[in-house]
Amino acid sequence: MIDLFSPKGKKDTVSTTNKDKSFEDGIVNIINKIKAGDKLLREEFINSYTPYIIRTVSNLTGKYVDVENSDEFSVGLAAFNEAIDSFDEGKNMFFFKFSTLVIKRRLTDYARHNKKHCHVYPFTYFEDKNNSYFEQIHLKSEIDLQNTYEISREIELYEQKLRDFGISLEHLAKCAPKHKDSKSLCIKIAKVIADNKELFSKLERTRNIPKTELLKLLKINKKTIERNRTFIIAAALIFGNDFNLLKDFLDISEPGGDNIERSTK
């Protein structure tokens, strides 16, 4: 039997072979008990996988991690705890791959926040081979993360949503706004739609952007919506359906761009 709290067990989580299924099932069982309110088990689980958190943070930042004094470690620890609460076995079969992405996302947010004040570490630490998470806003079907079970499963669900709107991933990549500020603005518009239950419901029901209602809420040019319809819909579907892993393919926290002014009507 594999000890779920042992370093050996932890290493086994990176494998997707059948022999690791019992380990993964055991982890899911632990996560479910923690989410059901077992605080002692949560503490034990986090303490047992602190070495995993340290290694993940170190690999992502390219820095030595001092547990006592590292802000990055604190971010990683909080992200691991967040991953426990947000893990959905229906979407993500492997917890540790999911938690790695959550840690990466939170370190990314931390780096962006601190870059406003000082150079904490270069963004290249977060690049994935030839594709940067910061520079590539639209979906890239060829990147390595899509080979994992979790991202593949989420992409499958996402593609079905897109098909309902007559959109393919290939078409989406071609339609993504080229200008940085335009992309940023479209993402903000998409978030407004996704965060508004009435707007998002109408989007899914009519298979189109509710322009009339949206223009009453925001002071934006109608042509901006029309020119970027495909990208705005695609982004709204990610936000509205809580596709957490796919959010890493959208630079949703990118600073700059046009600020959306709310209508006072």
Swiss-Prot record:
A motif (Polymerase core binding) lies at residues 71-84. Belongs to the sigma-70 factor family. SigI subfamily. It comes from Acetivibrio thermocellus (strain ATCC 27405 / DSM 1237 / JCM 9322 / NBRC 103400 / NCIMB 10682 / NRRL B-4536 / VPI 7372) (Clostridium thermocellum). Negatively regulated by the anti-sigma-I factor RsgI2. Binding of the polysaccharide substrate to RsgI2 may lead to the release and activation of SigI2. This is RNA polymerase sigma factor SigI2. The gene is sigI2. GO terms for cellular component: cytoplasm. It comes from the Bacteria. InterPro entries: RNA_pol_sigma-I (IPR014244), RNA_pol_sigma_r2 (IPR013325). It is found in: Cytoplasm.
